[in-house]
């Protein structure tokens, strides 16, 4: 995949070249999307809109730390949707990992989560965030046990994953109507990079065959159900639905 690669570390150690080789990235000086290695982290920038800033994965500080410490925990909609109850903490495959936010919430309340991400740039961002998270004194121990990244296309990987998870979680890219600054910023950068999930409808059936208990699909409240398969079961929040489908028992 072609992208502009920029090293701002000043280290001169070739770390960016190693990273590019690992993820199959090719430097393109004229590309409007840039993957930038800074002294702190790896980030994605839209070069023609510098005011948007950089997008990076941070499980240790910022919004994710606040959500972990002060968020709803088991009361969060995604936790309810996957079926967390009492001692039941399902094993989850997040087949559309993105920046890993929902996967991190589930891991922070005790679920083991395998994240799938097919875009190599997004996978590199996730891997960078995980490396920093694993090294953190406060969360590193449980994060290594509970949150893993698999760089693969969900459409192919969903038929290969073993052991089977109890839950498959899907949050396909869907055009956002919201005007919130964060959504606008991230979505504009993200959609410039990966575009809409045009093949997302093809995920529902393999997800239902893989999950032993249920499939959870996050949708904006105005979006039709995935693959136009309606379900009466959903956890509804302001702005979103978590549609719930039966999996395939062992």
From Swiss-Prot:
S-adenosyl-L-methionine binds at residues 101-102, 117-118, 153-154, 171. It is an enzyme of class 2 (transferase). Gene3D superfamilies: Vaccinia Virus protein VP39, YhiQ-like domain. Keywords: Cytoplasm, Methyltransferase, rRNA processing, S-adenosyl-L-methionine, Transferase. HAMAP family: 16SrRNA_methyltr_J (MF_01523). Specifically methylates the guanosine in position 1516 of 16S rRNA. This is Ribosomal RNA small subunit methyltransferase J.
